A protein has these predicted regions:
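C-terminal helical cap(s) of enzyme catalytic domains, especially alpha/beta-barrels
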Residues: 1-2, 70-79, 231-239
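Internal, glycine-rich beta/alpha segment that forms the wall or movable "lid"
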Residues: 1-56, 81-90, 98, 126-158, ...
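Structural preference for beta-strand elements that scaffold enzyme active sites
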Residues: 39-41, 59-61, 90-94, 221-224
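Short, acidic/polar
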Residues: 42-52, 203-217
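A conserved active-site cap/scaffold subdomain adjacent to cofactor or substrate pockets
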Residues: 54-66, 110-112, 125
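Short, conserved secondary-structure transition motifs
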Residues: 91-107
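Generic long, charged, amphipathic alpha-helical segments
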Residues: 177-210
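C-terminal structured "cap/appendage" subdomains that terminate the fold
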Residues: 211-239
Length: 239
């Protein structure tokens, strides 16, 4: 693809590719892009995804729940770049983040709690738990405790049409159980806590300060805003 974006074999879009899996010959019928090639964004936090991003991407769309987690991810990915002959500025770390604004911190916190409960219904909580456990958990009470048995890691690596998001499923399950016991969380409340992307909650001034802190302290190079309502959420943020 990069070869085609660069003008092909003759600089005019011609190509003749012979590969292991397929062969193709022809001419690209669109002019070369002024910027050379489209921006390549890799999405995901897996080890394979990080390596692909370090090798080939311009930006990585990620998610993490705290400043410390963001800094660890940032350092890990940036450290992979030199072996591919790339500098730190060649790859931008852009976590997807939500935000909830209020005239006061208390109002923002109240709005945030309501938004999260709307996002994670009783049924959704069970479905998200099934994606980790790789089992049918439809008989479990969403407000009850987590399963006392381990996830099924012997079968497929895809649950409910989605690939697994965790490199170590059993370790993640243990962490969730520990968090559930420590904070006395039922399934739904736990899922609300562990599945939410990074949220900036507060007054506009507080949110701006927090976002700047993440950039200045090497947890991100910027952000991809993910409002809970579109388009009104973006409009609220801009205003």
């Amino acid at each position: 693809a990069r070869h085609l974006w660069s003008g092909g074999d003759d600089g005019q879009g011609s190509f003749d590719y012979q590969g292991r899996q397929f062969a193709v010959r022809g001419r690209l019928d669109v002019p070369p892009l002024p910027q050379g090639h489209p921006i390549i964004i890799q999405a995901g936090d897996s080890t394979q995804g990080r390596e692909f991003a370090a090798r080939s991407a311009d930006a990585i769309f990620t998610r993490h729940g705290s400043l410390a987690e963001g800094q660890a991810f940032y350092a890990d990915v940036k450290a992979r770049l030199p072996k591919y002959g790339r500098a730190e500025h060649d790859l931008k770390i852009l976590p997807g983040v939500g935000f909830v604004l209020g005239d006061t911190p208390e109002e923002a916190a109240e709005r945030h709690a309501e938004v999260r409960r709307q996002q994670v219904s009783l049924q959704t909580a069970i479905v998200l738990l099934e994606q980790l456990w790789n089992r049918d958990l439809s008989g479990f009470d969403p407000d009850g405790p987590l399963p006392d048995f381990d996830p099924d890691v012997s079968a497929t690596t895809v649950a409910k049409g989605r690939t697994r998001q965790h490199d170590d499923t059993l370790a993640t399950a243990r962490q969730w159980r520990e968090l559930s016991r420590r904070e006395n969380l039922g399934i739904r409340d736990l899922i609300i806590k562990v599945t939410g992307r990074q949220q900036f909650v507060g007054t506009p001034a507080q949110v701006a300060e927090d976002m700047n802190r993440y950039v200045q302290q090497n947890a991100s190079d910027g952000f991809i805003l993910v409002p809970h309502l579109i388009p009104s959420g973006i409009e609220e943020f801009v205003d």
